[in-house]
Design a protein with these regions (language model features):
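Exposed, interaction-prone assembly regions rather than primary DNA-binding/catalytic cores
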Residues: 161-174
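N-terminal leader segment of winged-helix/HTH proteins
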Residues: 1-65
Length: 174
């Protein structure tokens, strides 16, 4: 299949992922690697590179509030849940499953962003509760959400839906 047929067949996916046709910048130029083992390898490298790029943006975004991306994630999870959650429940919902949730929560307690209390549902468990200070920090970041949104603002709603569908499909295949 030639490139023009492929572009017609895959439609906006080429544009969505900024797939570069000959003569344009792409992952190969970004990391100065001329050849990849195959398209699957190139896609994996591109996803890893994009992940690192996104993490850098998020680190920069939360730095002003003196928190880490993992702490931001926990604050968002607690606010979204609307109720206290155990550290196990937090770990299950976190974006970074390898995080040491207990240690992160302890740091957040020392900053006054969350509190820990014995669970009312199960006295053997400890619940993590969002404090007013933690909620205020989230509100400060909410007012600046357009900084994060700017990363994908150049994509149309259709492209964002396609991107989300493809990323979901990638994860759900395994």
């Amino acid at each position: 299949m030639n490139l023009s047929l492929a572009k017609n067949y895959f439609g906006r996916v080429f544009d969505l992922f900024k797939i570069k046709l000959p003569g344009q910048m792409g992952i190969d130029k970004d990391i100065k690697q001329a050849k990849f083992r195959n398209n699957q390898n190139k896609a994996m490298v591109n996803i890893m590179f994009t992940h690192a790029w996104m993490v850098d943006h998020i680190k920069s975004f939360v730095k002003s509030e003196n928190i880490t991306p993992q702490q931001y994630n926990i604050l968002r999870i607690l606010r979204g849940a609307g109720e206290p959650l155990s550290t196990l429940q937090l770990r299950e919902r976190m974006l970074d499953k390898m995080s040491d949730t207990s240690r992160i929560v302890e740091r957040m307690v020392s900053k006054g962003l969350v509190q820990k209390a014995v669970s009312e549902k199960d006295k053997r468990m400890v619940d993590v509760i969002l404090t007013p200070q933690g909620a205020e920090l989230l509100e400060n970041l909410d007012r600046r959400n357009e900084e994060l949104d700017a990363v994908v603002n150049h994509l149309s709603d259709e492209e964002l839906e396609t991107l989300n569908s493809l990323l979901d499909k990638l994860r759900n295949n395994h």
